[in-house]
Amino acid sequence: MPLPDTMFCAQQIHIPPELPDILKQFTKAAIRTQPADVLQWSAGYFSALSRGDPLPVKDRIEMPVATQKTDTGLTQGLLKVLHKQCSHKQYVELADLEKKWKNLCLPVEKLRTILELDPCEDKIEWIKFLALGCSSLGRTLNTAMKNVCEILTSDPEGGPARIPFETFAYVYQYLSGLDPELPAVETENYLTSLRLMSESRKNGMIGLSDFFVGKKII
């Protein structure tokens, strides 16, 4: 005969005091991030939580664009999550990057396509990968730099999205160097004009309103 179910009263069931808040924060994070595979994302979430690492969580819900309604495409929000997780080091190991990529439920094929733009061995400078990721969100240098500024800025959302000129110039020069049709002298002249602009304001910063470029980078 099967044993009868054991009945417990409320006083006998011990609920860890931190459990409700953990589940509450997890639920909020899942709603904001909208992972394509909740189980896979959850594994990455609790693994990062247990180690005290930055969590794979978006700052806010992103509205899907036309190409993202039926796939797991890369977005600015997901790139920002990766930036929080990887930017503490100058270089990121490709194996670690791939693990974090998978935890965000992004297709590995997309990662490999991005890395093919500037092949490397075992690691890549993080700011360069971020630049490549931003370039994959839009086919123009203007769009890439816009995404770079919005991810790196300390300004509030919807603000001027300013970043240091040195950072802007480094990323711009890197991406423009991947375009064989963009003369180096044109890049240098453009960056010189922006540098003079930032120096005239005495803040050394460049924001979205300071640039507009419409050339393809790949």
Curated annotation (Swiss-Prot):
GO terms for biological process: cilium movement; epithelial cilium movement involved in extracellular fluid movement; flagellated sperm motility; mating; sperm capacitation. The keyword Ubl conjugation applies. One of its GO terms (cellular component) is nucleoplasm. GO terms for molecular function: identical protein binding. SUPFAM superfamilies: Dimerization-anchoring domain of cAMP-dependent PK regulatory subunit. Testis-specific. Expression is restricted to germ cells. Sumoylated, sumoylation decreases upon spermatozoa capacitation conditions. Transmembrane segments: none annotated. Its main location: other. It is found in: Cell projection, Cilium, Flagellum; Cell projection, Cilium. InterPro entries: ROP_DD. Keywords: Cell projection, Cilium, Flagellum, Ubl conjugation. Residues 17-54 form the RIIa domain. Disruption phenotype: Mutant mice have normal testicular morphology and spermatogenesis but have moderately impaired motility and increased levels of ROPN1. Double knockout animals for ROPN1 and ROPN1L are infertile with normal testicular morphology and spermatogenesis but defects in sperm morphology, thinning and shredding of the principal piece. Sperm is immotile. Belongs to the ropporin family. PANTHER family: ROPPORIN-1-LIKE PROTEIN. Functions as part of axonemal radial spoke complexes that play an important part in the motility of sperm and cilia. Important for male fertility. With ROPN1, involved in fibrous sheath integrity and sperm motility, plays a role in PKA-dependent signaling processes required for spermatozoa capacitation. Component of the axonemal radial spoke complex 1 (RS1), at least composed of spoke head proteins RSPH1, RSPH3, RSPH9 and the cilia-specific component RSPH4A or sperm-specific component RSPH6A, spoke stalk proteins RSPH14, DNAJB13, DYDC1, ROPN1L and NME5, and the anchor protein IQUB. May interact with AKAP3. Interacts with FSCB; the interaction increases upon spermatozoa capacitation conditions. Interacts with CFAP61. This is Ropporin-1-like protein. It comes from Mus musculus (Mouse).
